[in-house]
C-alpha cells in the first residue's frame, strides 16, 4: 500500500488516467544524506527537483543508482533492501485493513493518525537485498524524525527572509516540539531603531515561506535558539502577552494537528485551518540598554586541571 506525496502523486495520477501501472522502487536502509534529502519539499525544492542532488552535495559524492531486476526503474545502489513493484491503477484498500483500529501510524505531531478510507496499492514484483541486510528505518515522532523534517522548514524561511531583508535573520530552528513543521524560533538582529517591527515582518514571511508553520517565536541575537530554556527565559523576561502576541486566524496550516478542526474552535472553518500566532520575545530597540545579560569572567580551567585539553 502507498500514500504518495507530491511530486510522486502527479506521476501516479497521470499513470492512472492512462490506465497504466506506475513502476516504483522503494529503497530501505540508505545513508543519512539520502534520508535528509528525502525530507525536502516545496517551496525549498520546487516540484520536479531532483532531491538526490542534495544528498550528493551533502556527502560530497553522487548517489549511485542501479537498474531494477523486474521493472523499468532505478533504485539506490547501496540500499540494504529494495522493493520493486507497480502502483496499480484504480485499486484502493483501507489503510487499517489489517488492524481495523481506525488508526494508521504515529505522525509527526505525536499522535496516531486516522486511517484513510482508500489508499493506493503497490503490487510487489521482487525484493532484493544485500547479504545479511540491516532493516533500518526512521519511526516518528522521535527526535531523529522531526529534526530531519525541520531542515527544509528552516531552509525555506532563511531563504525567503534573507532575500527580503539581508543580514537580519541570523538563524532559524524548526523546534522538535512542533514536529519540525509547526513551530519555528527565529533569531533576529535589530541594528537600529528603523529595524523595530521588521522582526514581525520576518515572522509573516516565515508563514509565507512554509505554510504548514503554526507558531513563530522571535528572539534577539543574544538568545540561543537551540536551547529551549534560553528561549523560554526570553519569553518570561522580554514578552508581554497583550502587546507582543500577533494572531492571524483562519489560515491554512496542517491537517495532522488534531486541534485544527471546527469542533475545537468556531473560527476554524475546516480541518487543516488554524490561528497562526507570533510571539515577539525581542526587546524593543529603545529599551535594549535595560536588557543586558549578566556576564561572567572566563575561567582558566588549566589553573585547576593542568592536563585538561
Predicted regions span which residues?
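Internal mixed beta-strand/loop scaffold within catalytic domains of large alpha/beta enzymes
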Residues: 1-27
Amino acid at each position: 500500500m502507498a500514500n504518495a506525496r507530491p511530486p510522486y502523486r502527479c506521476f501516479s495520477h497521470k499513470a492512472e488516467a492512462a490506465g497504466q501501472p506506475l513502476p516504483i522502487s522503494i529503497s530501505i536502509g540508505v545513508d543519512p544524506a539520502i534520508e535528509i534529502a528525502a525530507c525536502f519539499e516545496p517551496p525549498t525544492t520546487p516540484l520536479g527537483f531532483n532531491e538526490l542532488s542534495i544528498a550528493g552535495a551533502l556527502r560530497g559524492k553522487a548517489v549511485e543508482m542501479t537498474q531494477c531486476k523486474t521493472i523499468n526503474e532505478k533504485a539506490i545502489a547501496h540500499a540494504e533492501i529494495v522493493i520493486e513493484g507497480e502502483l496499480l491503477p484504480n485499486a484502493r484498500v483501507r489503510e487499517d485493513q489489517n488492524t481495523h483500529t481506525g488508526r494508521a501510524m504515529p505522525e509527526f505531531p505525536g499522535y496516531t493518525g486516522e486511517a484513510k478510507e482508500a489508499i493506493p496499492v503497490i503490487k510487489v514484483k521482487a525484493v532484493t537485498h544485500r547479504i545479511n541486510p540491516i532493516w533500518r528505518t526512521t519511526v516518528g515522532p522521535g527526535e531523529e524524525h522531526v529534526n530531519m523534517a525541520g531542515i527544509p522548514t528552516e531552509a525555506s524561511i532563511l531563504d525567503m527572509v534573507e532575500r527580503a531583508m539581508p543580514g537580519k535573520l541570523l538563524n532559524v530552528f524548526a523546534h522538535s516540539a512542533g514536529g519540525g513543521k509547526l513551530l519555528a524560533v527565529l533569531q533576529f538582529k535589530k541594528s537600529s531603531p528603523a529595524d523595530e517591527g521588521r522582526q514581525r515582518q520576518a515572522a509573516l514571511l516565515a508563514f509565507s515561506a512554509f505554510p504548514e508553520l503554526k507558531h513563530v517565536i522571535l528572539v534577539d541575537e543574544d538568545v540561543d535558539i537551540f536551547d529551549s530554556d534560553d528561549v523560554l527565559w526570553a519569553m518570561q523576561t522580554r514578552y508581554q502577552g497583550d502587546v507582543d502576541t500577533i494572531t492571524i486566524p483562519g489560515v491554512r496550516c496542517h491537517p495532522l494537528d488534531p486541534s485544527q478542526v471546527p469542533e475545537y474552535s468556531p473560527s476554524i472553518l475546516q480541518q487543516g485551518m488554524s490561528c497562526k500566532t507570533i510571539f515577539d520575545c525581542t526587546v524593543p530597540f529603545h529599551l535594549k540598554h535595560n536588557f543586558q545579560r549578566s556576564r561572567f569572567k572566563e575561567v582558566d580551567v588549566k589553573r585547576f586541571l593542568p592536563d585538561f585539553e
